[in-house]
Amino acid sequence: MVNNINQLGIEEILELLPHRYPFLLLDRVTDYTLGESITAYKNITFNEPCFTGHFPGKPIFPGVLILEALAQAAGVLGFKTAGNSDDLYLYAGIDKARFKHPVVPGDRLDMDVRLIKERRGIWKFHGVGSVDGKAVCEAEFMCAMRKL
């Protein structure tokens, strides 16, 4: 458990998200402002299951998993903002996705996600993934809030 009021450790993340190994892609939330933004990270290790086939001898963390990590951070922000754990956040669309640099074992993938707008259960976000302060992925995406 993390003591800072605007941080969440893995225990709190597990209480909010339905994802579990090997698909939980957040290690810690470092800051959030309800209804506005969230920052989080995932440590990328050689033990990630995706590296078995992506790519043997040259492991690169898949771009689609970076997008999923951004969406999971957005989901935490949504759950914390809306306060309803009976809902599920589902991807509804991805726009303007760009992959700028590869992410490899040993990197810390930092995520910065900002809420653009929310209307009728559709949340639109802008997310940036970075490593060592350098953007590796950027996208706008939408999540739909639905009952389980």
From Swiss-Prot:
The keyword Oxidoreductase does not apply. It is an enzyme of class 4 (lyase). Pfam families: FabA (PF07977). Coiled coil: none annotated. GO terms for cellular component: cytoplasm; membrane. Its EC number is 4.2.1.59. One of its GO terms (molecular function) is (3R)-hydroxyacyl-[acyl-carrier-protein] dehydratase activity. One of its GO terms (biological process) is lipid A biosynthetic process. InterPro entries: FabA_FabZ, FabZ, HotDog_dom_sf. It is found in: Cytoplasm. The keyword Transcription regulation does not apply. Keywords: Cytoplasm, Lipid A biosynthesis, Lipid biosynthesis, Lipid metabolism, Lyase. The active site is at 54. It catalyses: a (3R)-hydroxyacyl-[ACP] = a (2E)-enoyl-[ACP] + H2O. Belongs to the thioester dehydratase family. FabZ subfamily. Involved in unsaturated fatty acids biosynthesis. Catalyzes the dehydration of short chain beta-hydroxyacyl-ACPs and long chain saturated and unsaturated beta-hydroxyacyl-ACPs. NCBIfam families: fabZ (TIGR01750), PRK00006.1 (NF000582). This is 3-hydroxyacyl-[acyl-carrier-protein] dehydratase FabZ.
